[in-house]
Amino acid sequence: MPGTERANRVATVLQWILNIGLMALAAILVIFLAKETFTLAGVLFDANQNASTYMLVEGIVIYFLYFEFIALIVKYFQSGYHFPLRYFIYIGITAIIRLIIVDHESPNDTLIYSFAILVLVIALYLANTDRLKRE
């Protein structure tokens, strides 16, 4: 079956391209993670205490976002070249928490963001049930 062989070769080439792209993305994320580490250290020793605390909390949440994306890429390679849904939900929850920390001027927006977190937590619970769990 020459058509099947050709399709397998195309799939293999595309998988290699995807893997190389993800490794490049992981390297970039590690660089940003190191940069964020230095930024957090600078904010930690800043003399302006009020702005420093706010920036430190925001920086820590950004740090966790980088960390979660790197963990997602690692999990992709460990789990047979697929992205587990749970990790995307974790990233979504962390991103919305960061948004609440950064933009908390409107109570209505904060309530909507909190509802979105609740929906994601319910989705995470459903994704971790035995019927949907892959790992």
Swiss-Prot record:
It is a multi-pass membrane protein. It is found in: Cell inner membrane. It holds the Pfam family PsiE. The keyword Membrane applies. GO terms for cellular component: plasma membrane. Belongs to the PsiE family. This is Protein PsiE homolog. The gene is psiE.
